[in-house]
Structure formats: C-alpha cells, structure tokens
Amino acid sequence: MPKAAPIDRNLPGSIERRFPPESRSASAARAFVLAAGWSDDADTNLRLATVVSELVTNAILHARTVFLVTVVLKGETIRVGVRDNSAALPVRRDYQDLQPTGRGLHIVEALADRWGVAEETEGKTVWFELERENVA
C-alpha cells in the first residue's frame, strides 16, 4: 500500500469537516466534497463521490471514531484525505463474488489516480488524488 506525507491542511484551497462514525456520514461526506465545486466533469465527480464513499465507509466500519475529511486543490490535482483515530492500517482483502464487503480498497485503487496511507501521531489518514479533467 502506498505511503505518503500527511495532507497539508494549511494550503490555500483546503477545506475540512469532521463527521461522526454513523452511516449517514457517508452521504454527508460525499456532498461536502462535491460542494467544493473543483471539477465540472461528470466522470471526475463520480469518481470523487465513489472513492470518498469507500474511504468514509471504511472509517465508519473499522475505525469507529470521529473522522476528518480534508479536500485540497493543488494545481489540477484534487487530494482528499479521511483521517481517523485508529492506528490500524487498512488491508486490501480478497473477496468472493457473493460477499457484500471486501471490495472497498479495490475500488479505490481502480478509480483514484494515486492513493495511500499516512500514519499520524494519533491514527492515520487514507488519501487519494484525482487529476481534474475540466476546470470548474
């Protein structure tokens, strides 16, 4: 799994919001990320929403802590991080066709241009990057 430095939350063009570890937070986090309006490309927005959903769902199910979603625009790159307070690193699992879970990190890997994990003093940030197709 790729590793990288934590997201620089002090950059201009950076927004963040905390969410409770509840199932409704997945849709709220998707709306938060898309509301930034940093892409007007439908495919990019679908990829953003899908990968955010997967990472937030993992935080809700596995970390079970309040989590922070940070969105940074740097040039033509949109970088999103989901930071939780669990030190347990995500594990990409093999899955069976009929299993309802286990596909999340496979989806992240397929849709994100880059992704990884940054270990924090407390917890971790799972992040991904997408290149903007069109400037909003």
Regions of interest found by a model, annotated:
Residues 27-53:
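Conserved short strand/loop->alpha-helix "switch" segment adjacent to the catalytic nucleotide/phosphoryl-transfer site
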Residues 1-16, 60-136:
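Conserved beta-strand-loop-beta-strand hairpin that lines the nucleotide-binding pocket
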Residues 51, 56-61:
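Short, well-structured hydrophobic secondary-structure segments
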Residues 36, 40, 58-59, 118:
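Histidine kinase transmitter module recognition
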